[in-house]
């Protein structure tokens, strides 16, 4: 049974994720004129570039919507963002700079909460502005059907009639103007931006060329720290966690997680913290490029990971990071609520995050340049006296203990030496010239 409709279902209720921009405004009016009963749904995700959320539903009504709703998704979005930090659900990084999966997190929330609102209104057909080449078309498809198993999908941008009549921005602007809406296209930027409270994504157009970089981007959550005329002063910040939850910034306790995140964004944004340039694999395995902002996510992530390394042992940290990489990829693919993702997430929250209580003090400078100044926690397993270079009373172990430990290593050293001789005898290894060490063939320039 197909769930994707290739043509407009006239006479039926059709829900559209409405942003108020040119594309969704033209699509809504066009669908109304072609005979659909249009219902508009707008997600308040705390977008930093949106000044008046209440105006968007009113605009939808003016374009012909029977009903228009503004759905406040901010609390749920922050909840999912904190869960991602707790579980380290980030798999894309370049040179130590991390992409915090802010768009996938936003889609998980939007795709479930808007479809749930539609279901309340008896709307079982959903359309949005995602294109067939991107990730969002699959993310929204999965989250929508998870929320409403009876959902049908209608996307104007997959409808050939819509494309033929309103195939570009100029045609859509002319269409709105012809129907009395006096819609003026905004000036074309050199790239496209999508944002929510957790972060912003800049991509496409000029940014598709790798010779264009961060310098053409105008940050919406931070400052252009790469410019000499951008004044950025060092700032000391204290972040406090209690049982994995961020609860205070600079001594100010927050009961509202949204307010805490807004303050974290403001603090990190003053420095351009969390801004990065990534090449990534989309769900369909083609590579894309994006420049990302996530000042609050970056600030909380740095403090959280500092506590993780001071509290948990090496094997736990290794498992946390390996599972986080896997979970990040599932999140990116639109599988944040799949059973395998829930298993990884719940494990990290239960066995890693629950122990994360303490304060981390940082000095923020420009961009991702920062220093850790202090780490305090009642749960720290870091105890400097265990390894102090000074003489201490009641030492955890003695020289004799270390001699015994090293002696036990003779077993695997002997086994390894035997294996190396075997590899040498079979030609896999050879002796380095002038030294009694083993050397792989390609180390000497052997390309075979």
Swiss-Prot record:
Gene Ontology CC terms: cytoplasm
EC top class, as a word: ligase
Subunit annotation: Homotetramer.
InterPro entries: Arg_succ_synth_type2_subfam, Arginosuc_syn_C, Arginosuc_syn_N, Arginosuc_synth, Arginosuc_synth_CS, Arginosuc_synth_type_1_subfam, AS_cat/multimer_dom_body, AS_multimer_C_tail
Biological process terms in GO annotation: argininosuccinate metabolic process; L-arginine biosynthetic process; urea cycle
Pathway the protein acts in: Amino-acid biosynthesis; L-arginine biosynthesis; L-arginine from L-ornithine and carbamoyl phosphate: step 2/3
Protein origin, superkingdom: Bacteria
Major site of localization recorded for this protein: cytoplasm
Name of a matching Pfam family: Arginosuc_syn_C
Residues the entry annotates as binding ATP: 17-25, 43, 129, 131, 136, 194
HAMAP family linked: Arg_succ_synth_type2
Protein name, UniProt field: Argininosuccinate synthase
Locations listed in the record: Cytoplasm
Family listed: Belongs to the argininosuccinate synthase family. Type 2 subfamily.
Binding-site residues, L-citrulline: 99, 135, 139, 192, 201, 203, 280
Keyword DNA damage applies: no
Keywords, alphabetical: Amino-acid biosynthesis, Arginine biosynthesis, ATP-binding, Cytoplasm, Ligase, Nucleotide-binding
């Amino acid at each position: 049974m197909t769930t994707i409709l290739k043509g407009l279902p006239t006479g039926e209720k059709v829900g559209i994720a409405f942003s108020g921009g040119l594309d969704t405004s033209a699509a809504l009016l066009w669908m109304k004129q072609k005979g659909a009963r249009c219902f508009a749904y707008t997600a308040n995700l705390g977008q930093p570039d949106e000044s008046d959320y209440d105006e968007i539903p009113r605009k939808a009504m003016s374009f012909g919507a029977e009903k228009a709703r503004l759905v406040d998704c901010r609390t749920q979005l922050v909840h999912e963002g904190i869960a991602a930090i707790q579980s380290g659900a980030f798999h894309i990084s370049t040179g130590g700079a991390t992409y915090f999966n802010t768009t996938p997190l936003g889609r998980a929330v939007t795709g479930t909460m808007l479809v749930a609102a539609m279901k309340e209104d008896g709307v079982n057909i959903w359309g949005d502005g995602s294109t067939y080449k991107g990730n969002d078309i699959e993310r929204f498809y999965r989250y929508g059907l998870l929320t409403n198993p009876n959902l049908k999908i209608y996307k104007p941008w997959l409808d050939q009639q819509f494309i033929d009549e309103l195939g570009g921005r100029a045609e859509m602007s002319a269409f709105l103007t012809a129907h009395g809406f006096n819609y003026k296209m905004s000036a074309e930027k050199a790239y496209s931006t999508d944002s929510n409270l957790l972060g912003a994504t800049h991509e496409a157009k000029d940014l598709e060329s790798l010779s264009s970089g961060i310098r053409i981007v105008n940050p919406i959550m931070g400052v252009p720290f790469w410019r000499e005329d951008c004044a950025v002063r060092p700032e000391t910040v204290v972040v406090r966690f209690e049982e994995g939850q961020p609860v205070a910034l600079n001594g100010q306790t927050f009961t509202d997680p949204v307010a805490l995140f807004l303050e974290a964004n403001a603090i990190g944004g003053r420095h351009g913290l969390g801004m990065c340039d990534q090449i990534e694999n989309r769900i369909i395995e083609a590579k894309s490029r994006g420049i990302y902002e996530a000042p609050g996510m970056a600030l909380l992530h740095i403090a959280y990971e500092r506590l993780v390394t001071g509290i948990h042992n090496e094997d736990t940290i290794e498992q946390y990071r390996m599972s986080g990489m896997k979970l990040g990829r599932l999140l990116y693919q639109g599988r944040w609520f799949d059973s395998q993702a829930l298993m990884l997430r719940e494990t990290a929250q239960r066995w890693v995050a629950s122990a994360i209580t303490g304060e981390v003090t940082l000095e923020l400078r420009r961009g991702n340049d920062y220093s850790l100044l202090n780490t305090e926690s009642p749960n720290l397993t870091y105890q400097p006296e265990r390894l102090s270079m000074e003489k201490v009373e009641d030492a955890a172990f003695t020289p004799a203990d270390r001699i015994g430990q090293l002696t036990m290593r003779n077993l695997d050293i002997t086994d390894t030496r035997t294996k190396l001789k075997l590899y040498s005898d079979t030609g896999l290894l050879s002796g380095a010239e002038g030294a009694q060490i083993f050397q792989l063939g390609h180390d000497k320039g052997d390309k075979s």
